[in-house]
Amino acid sequence: MVSKQQTMGFQTEVKQMLHLVVHSLYSNKEIFLRELISNASDALDKLRFLALSNGSLFENDSDLKISIQINEKLQTITISDNGIGLSWEEAVENLGTIAKSGTKEFISQLTGEQAKDSQLIGQFGVGFYSAFIVADKVTVKSRRAGLQPEDGIVWESKGDGEFTIGYEKKSTRGTEITLHLKPENDEFLSDWRIRGIISKYSDHICWPIVMKKLSEEGKESKEFETVNKATALWTLQKSEISEEDYKQLYKHISHDYMDPLTWSHNHVEGKHEYITLLYIPAHAPFDLWQHEAKHGLKLYVKRVFIMDEATQFLPRYLRFVKGIVDASDLPLNISREILQDNKQVESIRAACTKRVLSMLEKMATNDKETYQKFWNEFGLVLKEGPIEDFANKEAIAKLLRFSTTASGSEKQEVSLEEYISRMKEGQDKIYYITASSYNAAKNSPHLEIFRKKGIEVLLLSDKVDEWLVGYMNEFAGKKLQSISKGKIELGDDETSEQIKEQEKTLEPLIKHIKSVLNERVKDVLLTNRLTDSPACVVADEQDMGLEMQRILQAAGQQVPVSKPIFEINPDHALIKRLHDIQDDNQFELWVTMLFEQAVLAEGGQLDNPADFVNRVNRLLVSS
């Protein structure tokens, strides 16, 4: 008997989601069962975890399982579990609302490919709504463990924008979901069809999934049998697990639609005993760059599920890794707070980090094509590594990939080891330039002398690159040097002597330029970097790089005041022309224009662009 029944409207986002799920996945209907079994498995995990500290939640029934029953006469499928269950408030919250951001992201991720889109619903935590792909009505009966039988609830909806919810006595805890199938979906009333779907998607679920036994004639009996392997797959030896099993387990724990690129499965014995199963995904999740996004590994203690998103077992720059840690020696009642200061956790973290880096190094060495796919998805995150993880800095540096002047492409595919193997005789530094974009880096005037001498330069245009080179100042004994900071020594004694001579000759001109630019520059020098451009701006050796200054300013942060050095090319026609200008106003116009032109060439911004345009126009008219 249902009491206190209410009719409520779905949140707007749920209506959108229902429409999207039903209409975008209609040709891959069978995934509804995978999603509902996955939810039931989570409910059993939660109950077992909470019962560690409150055994009464078992209510004298610790035989945890998922049950599936078919009723051909009523045209229904019922998926039930004796897990944690739902209270009234939880049913309204979990079945009637979703995060607004989730809907937006879901829509943006839809590809039109049924196989991919079918996996997205699990990734976005809306798997329950897949029930409406096959059902025209869904009934949920549930009671949260620990509540009274009278607190049982019944929730029902036709997926048409509203649902009803009321109280109904339920003697057992857990959740029972009944799907009233649409006439065209009667294929799912076949026992063998359902068993086939379970075998395909849910064989690896570690809880028993039970169905009624079939006689030799194909008739149901009253007895139940387990229809999945119901094994904690990761506890088996590698030789006992097929490649397909590994892939299916990955898809279950990650809600990903693609196979992983690779994985590492290890049983560790000794002072600490634990199992790790770590996966490298094939593509980046939608929330990789959201600071509050959940990440981390699933933690089990002696096969008992403890928590999702245990972030303590991997550093943040490896947040894309999915997997499981099953520790034998951690206390069952461990909390996130205790994990922070636990010596064994630190040991497992160090081992997991080295294992992931080793996996990636192996991939980079043996399968360059697959590693390039990985880099295209996760390279930007891996660049955070040397900043966060000093102990593994060298190992991470080997995995980094860059665009260079030799590669001739924006694609980041050159390793530091490759760069060193191509260094010119006598070259003892790894040269790089940072800029706001690949094109800005590729076309920087600072590259002119390096192109002339055939010296390769790393082109760094990701925002993280400025921090990266700040923490990684050398590799394999070779210092990394910015070509837009300080002096550049290319071992050309003849050029150095020539510049010294020119400095003496052009001293009056240099002083005159300094007096014009005054407080806008730290110094004016002759350059050895330019061959085609008249001038450039560089940062002093000890100052913050110009690109880093721009990044911090754009982020609204205080930036130490540092002025650029203005370097002029004495062999350029425009600089030679300055010699002949007698009129001070005209000289000032030319110098200011050349300086501002150099700032723009470096990707900088002018305080007053209109003044610059006006100056250029005046010079064009007078020339």
UniProtKB/Swiss-Prot annotation:
UniProt subcellular location: Cytoplasm
Ranges that cross the membrane: none
Region B: start-end pairs: 337-550
Region (A): 1-336
PROSITE patterns, per the entry: HSP90
Single GO molecular function: ATP hydrolysis activity
SUPFAM superfamilies: ATPase domain of HSP90 chaperone/DNA topoisomerase II/histidine kinase (SSF55874), HSP90 C-terminal domain (SSF110942), Ribosomal protein S5 domain 2-like (SSF54211)
Region (C) location: 551-623
Gene3D superfamilies according to UniProt: 3.30.230.80, 3.40.50.11260, Heat shock protein 90, C-terminal domain (1.20.120.790), Histidine kinase-like ATPase, C-terminal domain (3.30.565.10)
GO (cellular component) term, any one: cytoplasm
Keyword field: ATP-binding, Chaperone, Cytoplasm, Nucleotide-binding, Stress response
Family: Belongs to the heat shock protein 90 family.
Subunit structure, interactors included: Homodimer.
Entry function: Molecular chaperone. Has ATPase activity.
Protein name: Chaperone protein HtpG
Organism: Legionella pneumophila (strain Corby)
